[in-house]
Amino acid sequence: MDYDSVGVSLQDQDFFNAKLAAKMPWLGGQAGAVDVGGDYLVSGCDGIGTKIKLYLENKDVKGVSIKNLGQDLVAMVFNDIVCFGATPLFMNDYLAVPSIDDEYLELIDGINDALKELEGKPPLISGETAIHPDIETFDIAGFGVGACPKANYIDGKNIKEGDVILGLRSSGFHSNGYTLIRKVWLEKEALRSKDRDEIIKRLLTPSRIYVNTILAVLRKYAPSINGICHITGGGRENLNRLMGENLNLRP
């Protein structure tokens, strides 16, 4: 089973992204950067996809919380931004809901709690809540901004042959691939077994936020780090895009 079999075409997405790049000259990698004098402002926008649907289908499982989706959103936004060496400054959110429910306040609490754990404690400064009665489920997206001195900006252009690739252990699936994950797991007998709730809780584990770890590493080893990649949608292909056409990965 692959993405195509569940209605997600990565090839179509790549073609569409190429067309977008022609219309957005600042588009670059997992976030975009703007020169503001001595610094770069780095911005990113993301969502948490169909992990929301998995939550809604299993919200009654003990230990499952909508607050965790708030951490997922912060992770998706700022894990991208920190790849450029940027320290988080602030975040906005967009929440679309079928109707008003106090449950969504817990979702915002999850965002705020996650932001408080980041270096610099960036605030959630504003947002938009749209009531769309015709939609079946809620959706949320986040927009974040960070900053870094030009001298510390990392864009992968200095990656060269012989560089070593180091990986950080993830917390699980982050917030990507859940359309495929749901299809695979829901067809497995395991989700109808006594272990079902534990599997659901693991699938809904909030995404690890790597910001503080990456910034600490950069303070100590910045001159030796030529590129950073957030492995989410697309997996290892993200590394290939970062390295460019003339370099390849080797075990």
Give the location of each predicted region.
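Glycine-/charge-enriched secondary-structure boundary and capping motifs
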Residues: 1-7, 62, 95, 102-121, ...
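N-terminal glycine-rich phosphate/pyrophosphate-binding loops that anchor nucleotide-derived ligands
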Residues: 1-82, 117-127, 160, 165-167
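Alpha-helical elements of the RecA-like P-loop NTPase motor core of helicases
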Residues: 14, 179, 237
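Glycine-rich anion-binding loops of enzyme active sites
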Residues: 35, 48, 60, 73, ...
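Short amphipathic alpha-helical segments
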Residues: 56, 179, 240-241
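Alpha-helix C-terminal capping segments
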Residues: 79-87, 242-243
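Short, compositionally biased
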Residues: 178-189
